Structures are given as structure tokens and as C-alpha cells.
Design a protein with these regions (language model features):
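Phosphate-binding/catalytic loop of phosphoryl-transfer enzymes
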Residues: 1-28, 143-152
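ATP-binding/phosphotransfer module of carbohydrate and carboxylate kinases, centering on a glycine-rich
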Residues: 25-154
């Protein structure tokens, strides 16, 4: 993942901001929303893919195992979304990378914001927008490629 604050990439004190896997226990690691585990579950259902790039290219929302995987990872996904909402208070959370768009929409459909909007002093708390990126797997490359230009021009 990545964190953008005021239009700038936030790297954190040790350059690892956005490494969300660290928030899960050892027992939860295989149930976190990581595409490598969906690929394993699909293989157990007879759909063998050689990697995440093939998942992105060939994805079908009706494959056996997809709905079960989404249900399995939903608790960890929701913890992640709620942790981001509670600690960073983002205006938006963007789903991108190699995740197929229909799968991103499925995950978004499981979102449960656990804290009430009026949790503090009667002030309405806004939910972040949940957005599916159009950049696909090119997002990290495009972002990295833009950094030298940003440093030169801005």
C-alpha cells in the first residue's frame, strides 16, 4: 500500500509506511487480503494461475473460490480499513495495483465502518470514499517514474 498526505507520498520514519501486513497476527497472515492467497484458493478449486499478473489478466468474478475468499478475508480487510480510517482519517482509500476491478468492488461491498459517525462529541465523522483505481498494475511504476520529475519541477 501507499499513503499520500497533502499530495505527497508519505514514507514514514523507516521508509516502510503502507506495509499493512504487519498488523496481522501469524495466524491471520493467510487470511489477509493478499492476492497470493486467492491464487492458492483458486488452485484448490481447479483454476491454476502462474502468478498475480495472470490473475489480473484472466480474472472472472464467477470462478469457484472467489466468493469464499472474499468472505474469508473480510474481517482482516475491515480491520485494515478501520485502522486507516481511525489513524489517518483519509478522504479516500484507493484500491489498485494488480487487484482486478470486479474483485476490488466485491471487497468494498464487505466494508463495515465500525465506529459511529457521531462517536466524538456529537460531531459527524465522515467516511472515506472507497475508490477503485483505473491504473491497474501500472500504478507503482507510474508513481515511481514521476518522482524525479516532481523533484525537478516542483
Amino acid at each position: 500500500g501507499g499513503i499520500i498526505v497533502d499530495g505527497e507520498l508519505f514514507l514514514g520514519g523507516n521508509m516502510n509506511a503502507g506495509e499493512y501486513s504487519g498488523m496481522f497476527t501469524e495466524d491471520e497472515m493467510s487470511r489477509r487480503p493478499a492476492l497470493q492467497f486467492l491464487i492458492e484458493d483458486l488452485a484448490a478449486n481447479g483454476i491454476v494461475l502462474s502468478g498475480i499478473h495472470k490473475l489480473s489478466e484472466q480474472y472472472r468474478d464467477d470462478w469457484p473460490g472467489v466468493a469464499e475468499w472474499v468472505e474469508k478475508v473480510a474481517p482482516q480487510y475491515n480491520r485494515l480499513v478501520n485502522a486507516l480510517w481511525s489513524t489517518i482519517d483519509p478522504q479516500a482509500i484507493v484500491f489498485g495495483g494488480e487487484m482486478p476491478k470486479p474483485l476490488a468492488h466485491r471487497l468494498i461491498g464487505t466494508t463495515e465502518f465500525r465506529m459511529m459517525r457521531t462517536a466524538r462529541y456529537g460531531i459527524e465523522r465522515l467516511f472515506p470514499k472507497l475508490i477503485v483505481s483505473d491504473l491497474g498494475g501500472a500504478a507503482p511504476v507510474l508513481g515511481a517514474a514521476s518522482l524525479p520529475f516532481k523533484d525537478m519541477m516542483f
